[in-house]
Structures are given as structure tokens and as C-alpha cells.
Amino acid sequence: MSATKLTRREQRARAQHFIDTLEGTAFPNSKRIYITGTHPGVRVPMREIQLSPTLIGGSKEQPQYEENEAIPVYDTSGPYGDPQIAINVQQGLAKLRQPWIDARADTEELTVRSSDYTRTRLADDGLDELRFSGLLTPKRAKTGRRVTQLHYARQGIITPEMEFIAIRENMGRERIRSEVLRHQHPGMSFGAHLPENITAEFVRDEVAAGRAIIPANINHPESEPMIIGRNFLVKVNANIGNSAVTSSIEEEVEKLVWSTRWGADTVMDLSTGRYIHETREWILRNSPVPIGTVPIYQALEKVNGIAEDLTWEAFRDTLLEQAEQGVDYFTIHAGVLLRYVPMTAKRLTGIVSRGGSIMAKWCLSHHQENFLYQHFREICEICAAYDVSLSLGDGLRPGSIQDANDEAQFAELHTLGELTKIAWEYDVQVMIEGPGHVPMQMIRRNMTEELEHCHEAPFYTLGPLTTDIAPGYDHFTSGIGAAMIGWFGCAMLCYVTPKEHLGLPNKEDVKQGLITYKIAAHAADLAKGHPGAQIRDNAMSKARFEFRWEDQFNLALDPFTARAYHDETLPQESGKVAHFCSMCGPKFCSMKISQEVRDYAAAQTIEVGMADMSENFRARGGEIYLHKEEA
């Protein structure tokens, strides 16, 4: 934790400096590689961790080494992870997907923005200094056309996005030759289908079945295609966003870049303060990962924070505004029905979802059904025109373990299943949001209920937190639940930071949350038996046993912290080659002793073999040459 708290001015200045000096940066001893596909422009980025050779013998003067293979890993950092790419936040990222979108010839450019609010903001000269300068001309589907990845998948079309994803999900594991590295324990997949090799056809089939989604708005061409589904790698979402009391555009862009560097597969912009529209534009134009939002937050800002004053018209305008900016998925709390609200009355913590509480208040105030539910088909029509995926929000999720798995939670979940089928009628991609706060023994039921009632649409959960007693450590309490539900089949985990329940996360909190959740997601992949998931673990274990300290640091999810902890007690360069660490010291290192035992056993085997040969030689009378009949 920082010893001195920065002032607001200092925080903004630091963020501005970060943006001004931003350049593509590789992790220690890593390099960016690209694997090309058959579609034009399909060039999939990965990070390859270079390893040092293993000493296998020889003398001090002439040591003998065995090379260790480089380890390819999934990389979410986009251009920010490539030192060869010049970064300019003022201009935004290259439009990777634009040629693919244009080649499909099913979209048209808009001469006028569809949102009244957008037109008002663009006409306000006072916002010129805040506004991103290189605004895109938005596109939408041509009349009568649908431009969603689900629509293409159902038509039997393998898009470049699907091929990109297939290559990416395989993580370059076909490059690994070592049997030691390729060894993997069988997993327990709970019904997930995990093919040894992921093909573009498999991606298409999963999307067509609704078991996976590709969040890819046609107005966010900068994004690198990724997939969310239980038959793929478990993904992690990071939340960022300003509020009425803290954070700025500069800081949110900094957190975006920081999030992608530390492994965020998607980012949700949950801004609720001033300049939501302008902040989101900067984020989208500089994001290599899909961006999600909760549109009701901004709609509420438009009616001065008074939930009762919300209208369908204001919400619809917000959807159009955000869809034309390029938001890839919307969280919509359409399952909070009027008749479900009384079910929360006996709860210990009531309704804890911001979106859920807003809609519950509106329903009770007007004594009418949720207008998001009433207008859900119109929402789907908008999403189908831009390929915005729907993340059906769990507005009645439990906010304490006492309220877990109650009547209100599952009533809403069943309604989300009904809405899923409606969205699929419009070829709109859907995932389902889940809890929340759930003790460990009650977690699996959440997954089985979701699969049954939501027709295997991808599940996306916030944790869940497994205990309520650890404010300041809720990244850990929730990481336990996240690993479990990821193993059971959850497709994406929404990170929780140490600041959960306490305040808005800063840059370091974002990193802590992401590292915790990358651990949870990876542990789930291992438990499911995802092909190739164990390669990095095996490489780390081999480096650890061989005291290759630099390789251990570089293989870590956070190389910098691993190195820093080691160097607190052994900072000298000699410590990087020592066959011990400060935990046990040179005489009690279990791995050093284990190596000595192994060497001793090998020597003993040789000695036993030589003794046997000697005994055999003496038994034959000491003759050097055998008689022909004996040979």
C-alpha cells in the first residue's frame, strides 16, 4: 500500500504522463509472436516466454546444456504488448477488423447519429478539449440484414473472427514438443466438451448453438476477437469507470491499458460520473478487448439520478448512443420483475445490484412491469443491428451468503432463460450474469440451474464471494468461489478487487484483482482438463527444480512481484543461480536435497550394475572372451 496518498491533481498528472509516454512493452524475457490464419489479416498475437538452458553435465570449463522450449501464452495486451508498434492514445488503435466488416457488405455508414444525446454532445463546443479527436463514422446493419456473429454462425459461415479465435484458444500448444511439458492430469469437466484441437468450425458450432459468444460490435473494429463459453478457456473481466467523486478520463484510459496488460479478457466501463460519453469514446478507441457497459447507469444520469423519472425513450436513446460508439455488450436487468421484488423483503441485505435496485425502485414507484422486460424485443432489434451482445444482469443476486440461492435469485434466473430464447430469435448473442455471495457448498447448484434454465448460454459471475468476513481481502474470498464455479462450467469471471465494498479501485487494486482472477481461471482450466493448460505449470516446476530463478520469475503471472520477493533477501546476482532460496537456506532446501538423492540413486544403480557384472565375470572363470556356444 502506498505510504503517501496522491492528491487528485497528482493522480491526474501521473495518468497523463502514463498516456503521453505509453509504448509497446514486452514482459521480461518475452517476445511477441504472431500466428497467421487462412483469412486475410488473421494474425493472432501471443506472448512467448524465452527460457534459459538446463545444465546437464560437463565440467566447469566445458559445461553441457540442454535447451528449454519457449512457452507460448495467451496475450490480451493487444498492441500494448508489442514493442515494435508505435502507440498514440490520441489517435487510437489500428482498426484490425475493419476490412472483415467491410468485406461482408451488410453494413452502411450513418450520416446522422441515431441518438439525440449524442447529437447534443457533438454540438457542444465546450466539450472539444475532452473529446476524442478521431471519431469514427458509425455503421449499422443494412435494412433487413443482421450482422451478428451468431447470425453468421447459424448460416454456416466461418468468419475471420472465428478463425482468429480458434488459433488463439489453442495457445500455440502445437509448438511444444517436450513430453515433460505436454504431460497433463485428466480433468473433471462436468459435461464440458474440450477438444484436443480447437478448429474454426468448432468455434462456429459453439456460437451457433448459443453456448459461446463473440462480443464484437461492428463499431469497435479495434478489438481482437475473443470468445466466452464453457468449452473454451475461462475468461476474466475487469471493471473500470469514473464516479461523481473520483477519477478522470486520463485515469480510466490508464486503467484500461493496465487491465489488458495484466490479463483482462474484457473490460466493463461502469462510469457514473460526469463525461460518461467522452470517457467511453476514449476507452473504445484504445481498447484491444471487448468493452461492456450497464446502460441504465447513464440513462439514470440523464434524468438527474431519479430512478422514478426513467423512461423507455431515454433508455433506448442510451442504447443507440452506446451501440454506435462501439460497446460490445450491454448488461440489461430485464429479469427484475415487479412480482419478484417482494421476494427480497426477508433478505438480510436486500437488493445489492445497482441496476437491480434502480429497476426495482422504478417498478414499485409506477407499480408497472419492468420496462426493460416490456421492451425486450426492441432491445434485441437494436443489438442485432450493431452486433451488441446481451449480458442478462442478475439484479436480484445475493449480497450476502445468508441470502444465497434464495427464491428471488432463482426466479430471476428462470426469467433470464426465457429472455435468452427471445434474444436468439433475433440472432443476438447472450450470456447470463450470476452471483454474488455464495458459500462453497452451494456454488455448484448455481451452475446446474443456469445450464438447465438458460439453455447452456455462457455464465458470467461476480466471484462468487465465499465468506463475508474479509473486507480488504475480498479478491481472495471471491477468488475461491471463482475458481470453483469456473471449474463447474462458468465461462467468464468478473474480477473483485481488494477495494470491493470499500471504495473505487485504483491502478494497483486493478492489478491485484486481475492476478487473483487469472489464478482462479487458470486453476479452473486445469481442473476441467483444458488441453495444454498444464504446460506453463510444468515449465515452472521444471525451472524450480533446476534452480533456474530467472525462468521462474518470467514464467510467473506477475514476474515483477516474484522477482521483488526473491530479491528482498537475496538481491545479489549470485542469488539468481544459487541452488536454494532464503526460505530454507542452502542446507535444508528440499529440491537441492532431492537432486542429491536422485544423483546418489543414479550412482548407486551404476555401482550395483558394475558389481553384478563383476560377479558374473568371476563366475565364468575370469575369461575375457566367451566360447561361441556361450555367446
UniProtKB/Swiss-Prot annotation:
InterPro entries cross-referenced by the UniProt entry: ThiC, ThiC-associated_dom, ThiC/Bza_core_dom, ThiC/BzaA/B
Gene3D superfamilies on file: 6.10.250.620, Radical SAM ThiC family, central domain (3.20.20.540)
UniProt enzyme class: lyase
Reaction(s) catalysed by this chain's protein: 5-amino-1-(5-phospho-beta-D-ribosyl)imidazole + S-adenosyl-L-methionine = 4-amino-2-methyl-5-(phosphooxymethyl)pyrimidine + CO + 5'-deoxyadenosine + formate + L-methionine + 3 H(+)
Keyword annotations from UniProtKB, A to Z: 4Fe-4S, Iron, Iron-sulfur, Lyase, Metal-binding, S-adenosyl-L-methionine, Thiamine biosynthesis, Zinc
TM spans (from-to): none
Oligomeric form and interacting partners: Homodimer.
Function text: Catalyzes the synthesis of the hydroxymethylpyrimidine phosphate (HMP-P) moiety of thiamine from aminoimidazole ribotide (AIR) in a radical S-adenosyl-L-methionine (SAM)-dependent reaction.
Protein name: Phosphomethylpyrimidine synthase
Organism: Shigella flexneri
Source taxonomy: Bacteria, Pseudomonadati, Pseudomonadota, Gammaproteobacteria, Enterobacterales
